[in-house]
Amino acid sequence: MNTDFDLLLAGAGHSHLGVLNQWADGERPMGRIGLVSAEPHAWYSGMMPGLVAEHYQPRQCRIGLPRLCAAAEVEFIQGTLVALLPDTPELLLATGETLRSTWLSLNLGSLPWLPEQSGDGMELLSVKPFADFIRRWQQWQESPEPVAILGGGPAGAELALAMAGRVPAIHLFCAGELLADHPRRLRALALGHLQRADVQIHEHVSIQSVHGNTLIGDDGQIHWRGRRLVVATGPNPLDWLRDSGLRLDGDGFIEVSPALQSRSHRHVFASGDCASLPGAARNGVHAVRQAAVLATNLSRAAIGQPLRHYHPQTHSLALLADGQRGALMSWANLAAEGKLLGLWKDHLDRRFMRQHGNRD
């Protein structure tokens, strides 16, 4: 394969899906473009709790990348990225193959923070990558056992509600308060749903390690014994970014300008969870919204035109699945719950999939 490109898209996150969708509608830049992804499908994170709750089938929650790429006249390259040389720029794949490009866009996502583990008495299941999570969750369901979940954010709360009734017991561990970054009303609603679902909630318990079949907190105490742990902690950058030469923030994410352009390498763009932009929290809402700006800027940069800026909204709508086909909603300091919100969330999720996954 000729490994030289005019533009490479690394990763198939929500921003790049939106870019491909726009290009499929006829706004594609000139030149040879490729997309690199470790998997042939992109999973839509908003539908993962519904998939766990068996409200959806796997095929309803994933987007076939070869088909979407073909519609956008983009070459699909299946491979795992292990290194980046931004000065060239070049991408190194796990196979040893090197891809070169004039322009590079990174939408790599993030991974949950994992506690240190000693011994093999407990299986750890990270919520990302989604393909691995779904495959192993389905294996666990063949012989259900009690489960602990690490993570007091939306992902942890939604998964606990989705898993309720499908395993004998669930323990949800939060380093601080549940949904600490969300309105108090939403937190109260979520606590009520979790308690009614018999989820045992452990707030202000910071789990630091796994020893055998036990969870150990930062106080040195044992907080749970069991064999299965789901990790839905906050976003952690990919390890190899530290050695990439890109300018990173203090947490290891790629610093970008409001144009989603690397602060250190003007021919590199980044969006979604892997990028660090003041005011843009790491959630799917911003990743989806960044797609339009990114698509425009990738076209403009190649021909030397001024770039657009992405302006994060002060407040983002949050819709959390309640495991019973309803949803919890928050906007600014407002919060609500109900079946109608669940229908609305389902409509939005299915619309996203139609826009990105049903190309002839």
List the predicted regions and their residue ranges:
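FAD-binding core/adjacent interface of flavoenzyme oxidoreductases
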Residues: 2-4, 8-10, 71-146, 219, ...
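Beta1-alpha1 glycine-rich phosphate/pyrophosphate-binding loop at the start
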Residues: 2-74, 158-184
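Short glycine-rich anion-binding loops that position phosphate/pyrophosphate groups of nucleotides
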Residues: 15, 109-112, 235-237, 325
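A Rossmann-like FAD-binding core segment of flavoenzymes
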Residues: 76-84, 91, 99, 167-258
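FAD-site-proximal beta/loop scaffold in flavoenzymes
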Residues: 122-144, 224-227, 232-292, 296
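Rossmann-like NAD(P)H-binding beta-loop-alpha module
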Residues: 136-173
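Internal hydrophobic alpha-helix adjacent to the cofactor/substrate pocket in enzyme cavities
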Residues: 286-313, 319
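C-terminal auxiliary extensions adjacent to catalytic cores
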Residues: 324-360
